[in-house]
Amino acid sequence: ARWGFLSSQAKQPTIGKTIDESMDAIERENPSLRDVLPKVYARGTLEPTRLGSMIDLIGNIALGDAKARSADVLGHVFEYFLGEFALAEGKKGGQFYTPRSVVELLVEMLEPYKGRVFDPCCGSGGMFVQSEKFVADHQGRVNDISIYGQESNQTTWRLAKMNLAIRGIDSSQVKWNNEGSFL
């Protein structure tokens, strides 16, 4: 599941299968992502050349020194795509994405230096990302906060789990809850 291997296979007609196998490997190594990552690329619904082009595109974004390939860069790329999808979806896209400026304002008002951060409708997890960023920016200890959340839409919950995993944030207490009640 190494990026270098995926990049080297990007032009192969079996790239979809390679991506699915990589997703399985990532889930094995990261139990919090179990049954979260999509494994649909080998089905043939996406043309292998398009998958390869997407791998090349993402690889070009992450080129540079080790710092440029940090979780923060991947997180920003992920957030950018979420924003673009939300714009394309219109009102429906607001279900999983709250603009960064709104989340930043909420976090600044809450000042989550320590304790629990609970988001009952966590969407893609932006509140958790900004809370940890707030703590780090104010020379606090990220381990002094614990995040808890729920999401009723399973696809959106998966987006949150991926978003947090990319940034190295523990998502074990972010649950899928389609019951319509607080956990």
Spans of features found by a protein language model:
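Conserved S-adenosyl-L-methionine
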Residues: 92-183
